[in-house]
Amino acid sequence: MKHVKAVIFDWAGTVVDYGSLAPMGAFVETFEQFGVSITIDEARGPMGMAKRPHIAALMALPRVAQAWADKYGHAPGEADIDAVYDVFVPKNIAVAASYSSVIPGVADVASALRSDDIRIGTTTGYTREIMAEIVPGAAAQGFSPDSIVCTGDTPEGRPSPYMIYKTLPELGVWRAKDAIKVDDTEVGIEEGINGGTWAVGVAVSGNAFGMAENDVKALAPHEFAWRRKAATEKLKAAGAHYVIDSVADLMPVVYDIEARLARGERP
């Protein structure tokens, strides 16, 4: 393509791990180990952030902070966040490979992008240790990006644009408007907006829907419709220029953005 130069994907819930399920059990188990219960819905709230800020956000929830204070006699502080994080990371690493299945359609879209001379980048809220468990399996299934930028590679994670700014030069792209960020989380969409890229939300395969593929397929049509509408509205409220069900639906959006850039439009 002449105008679109790069697509930057998130990982969990966008290209692997349908429903973004891997971190959820790890978060719940970790807090349970400290004698504080959290729900899956609570755990999902800050998804897309780096994992230590994610834990900090969970511990700042009034109900969780009160439960922590009841258990330990003080409000959660930095040392407590570190303690929870140190327990969480090995749990996430342990399950990551089990949730590295590439989401249907991703490999075909990656091939189509390469056929159009579009570079493929990725950013993630995962650490490099966690990604080491995911990348080989994804590559074997047909998804191997040109760039992977992880939590810890930049001064701040999402919603800051630092990971975008690191990715673009690695892809040889210097105009952010020529890139598309694809993400299933609100902070991931904000990352793209803050970085000056086009932003495409993924509603059904990711965190906003939060269900395994088989469970999604089993939903009654009316329930699927309202869940999809709610997920779409969340991502649009975060600033997404487009919202698709999954990456399998991406190529028509890429062509539309190509046409808009040709007309002189900007994100």
From Swiss-Prot:
Q: Which UniProt keywords apply?
A: Hydrolase, Magnesium, Metal-binding, Schiff base
Q: Which gene encodes it?
A: phnX
Where does the record locate the signal sequence feature? none
Q: Where are the transmembrane segments?
A: none
Q: Where is the active site?
A: 10, 51
Q: Which GO terms describe its molecular function?
A: magnesium ion binding; phosphoglycolate phosphatase activity; phosphonoacetaldehyde hydrolase activity
What name goes with this protein?
Phosphonoacetaldehyde hydrolase
Cofactor details (free text): Binds 1 Mg(2+) ion per subunit.
